Amino acid sequence: MDLTQIQNPSFLKDMSISELEGLSEDIRKFLIEELSQTGGHIAPNLGVVELTIALHKLFDSPKDKFLWDVGHQSYVHKILTGRAKEFGTLRQYQGLCGFPKRCESEHDVWETGHSSTSLSAAMGMALARDLKKTEEYVIPIIGDGALTGGMALEALNHIGHEKTDMIVILNDNEMSIAPNVGALHNVLGRLRTAGKYHWVKDELEYILKKIPAVGGKVAATAEKIKDSLKYLLVSGVFFEELGFTYLGPVDGHDYEKLFETLQYAKKTKGPVLVHVITKKGKGYKPAESDVIGTWHGTGSYKIESGDFVKPKEVAPAWSAVVSETVLKLARTDERIVAITPAMPVGSKLEKFQKEFPDRMIDVGIAEQHATTMAAGMATQGMKPFLAIYSTFLQRAYDQVVHDICRQNLNVFIGIDRSGLVGADGETHQGVFDIAFLRHLPNMVLMMPKDENEGQHLVYTAMQYEDGPIALRYARGNGLGVQMDEELKAIPIGTWETLKEGTQAAILTFGTTIPMAMEAAERLEQAGVSVKVVNARFIKPMDEAYLHELLGKNIPILTIEEACLIGGFGTGVVEFASENGYHSALIERMGIPDRFIEHGSVTKLLEEIGLTTDAVVDRIHTMIPSKQKRA
């Protein structure tokens, strides 16, 4: 079937099971071929082909609402709703988004990117439906990994309490990105082996209703028998106890079983949870055999061999530099522990996990718990290293404020994927952390200019004993600089001069330092002398350096790959104002006040005007022509 000709899912209504099976093969082949060129979330989507087709066949989108938790498994949904022809632009600048996007299609009713949000949003939609007295199904699709998130459990509790009509699809592939952890995962494991609980339960209830009601004792005994048999028949009744009708487990690749169960769910009042078992990566052997999450999201790859197409790496990944330095220090300090909220592979903690399994803690998709747990460990003299993506640190903000900073606890937060991350887009850009951490009392915030300074700042963080400390580091690779063999602590709150200059100064840090250095060299050739400063401590700033620089009364330009509002540049302006430098000319470059969508980092930097050319032009406008050297 030519998938690019699909306009909407209505064509599925008249298709037979054999035709649907052929469509499944076509979709898998299409995904494998297209994503081999663009990259993307291949394994999650190969696992939900039949489930997605079944949902679109039995329900009527967009009247009926599908909410894809996390959203990375929505590619099949996009194909069935008329977007197959756009897959060549997947996750590229101004191309097809890798997550549901309301402006893309009326079938995308809820935008996602972070996990565990679908149930709360679905509850909101269902309550709105009931208040408006309309009739449509609300169907969140959530994975077993996302179900470990506290927000999802809060929503389950509320939905069950209110007895709201809703069909929750639990897509259980036994993995989120890496293998799942936690007691709830173990409950689901028991449910997988318990058989078709709901059919047996119905027969049981029918039989028990036939027992003659000869007095209250017999009736009470019958109810006790029913409850006892319910616990005997299935080793976990977690969802039933929350108020849901539990249906399953059902084979998520068997159309007959899917149709049977979903039709039953449609007729059932109140909240229903359909437990669907799927195989992540189904139909592509390299993805099927992946047990650590390598094929969850990929770049381009060779279909035949399953080898990834990677540019030749001349420098280590930032995540590896940080995690391997932590590992090196952990070998001589038993107090060091590593903590991750379900991202051991992305944060490059596999080596730490292998060498120190008892000191490597993966809490699952539970950022709030991970953060406060780290705080608890710090109270007992441990040295917790919390490795967390910038975008996911947003989810634990209250814990950072209330539990870490307020108590001034020694927690080292490794803020991975800081700055623009590219193809994953606006839900994953790490551009807000400076603004939401800089104003917190007791917090120290750093970002290195290269991987050598990075390892020294990791050492600095592990030696620091006066409170919380955080290190920002980017996605991707370092610069390939020579690494010192001996680690050293860098004095807190100190900056360094990278290039001397007399007519203007650029203050920056991290990934924008090469841009600043190149701009300064070009300006030098044009007769403009510009100082470049490595402001590696975003907080506390180097106040002595700032006093000296502001005293020279030369134009200052701050550059940051982070949001301008509340950012580093704002801090410099505040310092100048509070210290009486009212005539100082300070301008800022950074991320504007909007969400930055998907695309390559290079393209996104061009789009927002954060380039070497833009820096050169800005400095020229800040320096009067008569002050420029001939």
From Swiss-Prot:
Keywords: Isoprene biosynthesis, Magnesium, Metal-binding, Thiamine biosynthesis, Thiamine pyrophosphate, Transferase. It is an enzyme of class 2 (transferase). GO terms for molecular function: 1-deoxy-D-xylulose-5-phosphate synthase activity; magnesium ion binding; thiamine pyrophosphate binding. One of its GO terms (biological process) is thiamine biosynthetic process. GO terms for cellular component: cytosol. It catalyses: D-glyceraldehyde 3-phosphate + pyruvate + H(+) = 1-deoxy-D-xylulose 5-phosphate + CO2. It holds the Pfam family Transket_pyr. Its EC number is 2.2.1.7. Thiamine diphosphate binds at H72, G113, H114, S115, G145, A146, N173, Y284, E367. Pathway: Metabolic intermediate biosynthesis; 1-deoxy-D-xylulose 5-phosphate biosynthesis; 1-deoxy-D-xylulose 5-phosphate from D-glyceraldehyde 3-phosphate and pyruvate: step 1/1. Catalyzes the acyloin condensation reaction between C atoms 2 and 3 of pyruvate and glyceraldehyde 3-phosphate to yield 1-deoxy-D-xylulose-5-phosphate (DXP). Homodimer. HAMAP family: DXP_synth. Belongs to the transketolase family. DXPS subfamily. PANTHER family: 1-D-DEOXYXYLULOSE 5-PHOSPHATE SYNTHASE-RELATED (PTHR43322), 1-DEOXY-D-XYLULOSE-5-PHOSPHATE SYNTHASE, CHLOROPLASTIC (PTHR43322:SF5). This is 1-deoxy-D-xylulose-5-phosphate synthase. It comes from Bacillus mycoides (strain KBAB4). The gene is dxs.
